[in-house]
Amino acid sequence: MSQVRSPFVVVMGHVDVGKTLLLDKIRGTSVAYREPGMITQHIGMSFVPWSAVEKFAGPLVDRLRLRGRIWIPGFLFIDTPGHAAFSNLRKRGGSVADLAILVVDITSGLEEQGVESLKLIQSRGVPFVIAANKLDRIYGWKSVENRPFLFAVEDQEWHAVATLEERIGKLIEELSRHGIDADRYDRVRDFSKQVPIVPTSAVTGEGIADLLLVLAGVSQRFIPRERLQVREGPAKGVVMEVKEERGLGVVADVILYDGTLRKGDVLVTASLEGPKEARVRMLIMPKPLEEMRDPEDKFMAVEEVKAAAGVRVVADGLEGVVAGSPLIAVWDPREIPNACNLVKEEISEIRIESDKEGVIVRADTFGTLESIVLFLRQQGVPVRKADVGPPTHKDVVEAVLSRRKNPIYGVILAFNVKTPPEVEKEAMSSGIKIIAGEILYRIFDEYIKWSQEVRTKTIEQILSQLTRPGKIQILPGFVFRRSDPAIVGVKVLAGTIKPGVTLVKDGREVGRIMQIQKTGRAINEAAAGDEVAISIHGDVIVGRQIKEGDILYVYVPDDQARQWLFQYRQYLREDELKALEEYLKSRRK
């Protein structure tokens, strides 16, 4: 037998857009309108029952004709906003998160981390709603505590509504540049094609009712009922955080999305070494609010916890467990090997170790590692190795090997991890770049900028080893010496000439340029249009092998000619390309 759980909701967005305040306001709604004795608190998340939403948003529920039509029990809001929590809410083939709220500052639009959040939500295929927050900052807006937006907008002066429309219009434009078709939620005709924008104020509570009702509508429209069904049996979940608790030792904050977790259960989860077993000693949940007499006494031990829930697990063997790891409870000891295999398969899909060319990636959790690798692949950046934890000596070695295949892959991308000083020093001495940071898109942008610089430098080095094509004509009346070396005045008709290049006439080599002079001074090269004097070393006499008015070409070895034509053609000027083609034609005569 199975029951339907509440969908998990994650709040995301740029720093200072009001994510935490919005969550606080939503939680406050739950506390104020909950049924007596109802547990709304979990470890790491908060339950907002639908009954509380109906009470809070009563008139709007009736206006939108939603009363009696919502079958979800409520919402489970993840308490930690941001991309790290969203990334760790991972499971094989997708995300544990069922819904996301992308919070945007209505006064400043879509900002850097907002774009990052948007891309992350899209990459996991999670339905989302946009909260256009800070509605109370619209000039002239008249606020009323907790009023639904649809009622509030009807009570505003025209200039406040005009400003709001302008801000929403700009936001819609910004979103369209990222491939998102969005509109104010009451104007959306097809929720399968458009993303709803709900104007909100986390300060006054305006629009919170609308946001919760739109979330309910989106969840029922886009989340299959089977996804929210919780089965009887051992628990499945994901580790959100692992930490040391005084008096308890290492504990794990876990979100359960299926089954039941009991005291004494064997758990299979993951460390950097692979699958790891642990045995539950204690399960900790927050006390119901009405039982919290003492602020220091917020928690209670329980015998079992049913999904969906957030629970603190005290267990022997949690040392080294990594956030973002899958968690499988085992009731039958014979199932432990099977659970270990499932965990091993799941984390091996995230961790990458190959001999292919690509960058090295390091991240703080399995969840963020998976998100980064997914994003890099979408951007066409191959990954040679990806793992959890700080960069190591082995990573530097791998980056050096990868660089041999392609210089732009001689790099380590480190997300939210600190590089040990000795590894940093080794990377520097090996010429390996480490790009570190806490914002994925900044790391990526820095990598793209660096790789372009490396590509340019590499091409410059290659081109400097190639002989550039050139075409010259011996100027009549400017023979200064006939031989040993011959010194003549020439005009560069196309391309470039430099000391050291060999000259060719009618496909035959006639000698090598020793020196180039212009107005009595030695120069390193002469380009098309220049008239210069050159000395030619070799078995050449002016009047025999070469004559005044002759056309000579710079000798370009066959392999280099092929490189110019098929690999580096775009780096030749038009006159150089023409000179090369004429030279090759003269060789075929």
Swiss-Prot record:
Binding site for GTP: 13-20, 79-83, 133-136
Span list, region G4: 133-136
Region named G5: 201-203
Nucleotidyltransferase is among the record's keywords: no
Keywords, comma-separated and alphabetical: GTP-binding, Initiation factor, Nucleotide-binding, Protein biosynthesis
Annotated spans, G2: 38-42
Location of the tr-type G domain: 4-225
G3: annotated span: 79-82
Listed GO biological process terms: translational initiation
GO CC terms of this entry: cytoplasm
GO MF annotations in UniProt: GTP binding; GTPase activity; translation initiation factor activity
Region described as G1: spans on this chain: 13-20
Family: Belongs to the TRAFAC class translation factor GTPase superfamily. Classic translation factor GTPase family. IF-2 subfamily.
NCBIfam families: aIF-2, PRK04004.1, small_GTP
Protein purpose: Function in general translation initiation by promoting the binding of the formylmethionine-tRNA to ribosomes. Seems to function along with eIF-2.
Record protein name field: Probable translation initiation factor IF-2
Classification of source organism: Archaea, Thermoproteota, Thermoprotei, Thermoproteales, Thermoproteaceae
Gene of this entry: infB
